[in-house]
Amino acid sequence: PMEQLILKMDDKSDVNVIAASAYNFRIELVKKVGKSDIPGLIDISHCMADRFGTQALLTKTNIPKYFNSETLPFLARYKGEIIGYIIGVPLEYFKQESWAHFDVNLSKKNTLYTYAFVVNSKYRGKGGYGKTLKRIYINWAKKQKYTYVTGHVEQGIARRFHARTEIVKVFPEWYGLKTPFEYYRRS
């Protein structure tokens, strides 16, 4: 059945360009992912899998689950090539997950969970691509009336975020990874 989904997919993604620079860098909000972007998305997800294990890999099967009209998926492109993405998902999508119940805002529909945020390693720390992607994502979330943006990061990382970021809970075990992860909330 998944192959049928992919066959029905348009070749090109349906996107809104949210920001563009004169230097061939742009950020797009994906309304519907197209076949031509699947290889680039899968490639870039390998940058996440190196740190977070194979469950972080995007596949032909799970891409439509995260890149659709119910989520907030943004792509960063440089010279037409996908160099990063960030995916926001309403917290309520995760109500079956035990970790989500530590968030007092579950079921209030005011929290956007950052499911994935990755920038190709050769573009990290250069040109501000990742920072720009994150800033646009957070501003867009606010425009969509989300009060909070949350996510999981390796322990110690969230304290480098915005001043209005709090650590809700530390998870010593996170999906078999060796380092503890913290669940943060940014207002």
Where are these regions (language model features)?
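Conserved GNAT acetyl-CoA-binding A-motif
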Residues: A141-E154
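Conserved active-site tyrosine of GNAT-family acetyltransferases
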Residues: A158-R164
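C-terminal "cap" of GNAT-fold acetyltransferases
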Residues: L7-D10, D14, V168-S187
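Conserved acyl-donor/pantetheine-binding loop and adjacent beta-alpha core of acyl/acetyltransferases
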Residues: I82, I86-A116
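Short loop/turn motifs at secondary-structure junctions and domain boundaries
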Residues: P64-S69
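Conserved acetyl-CoA-binding loop-helix of GNAT-fold acetyltransferases
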Residues: A116-V119, G125-N139
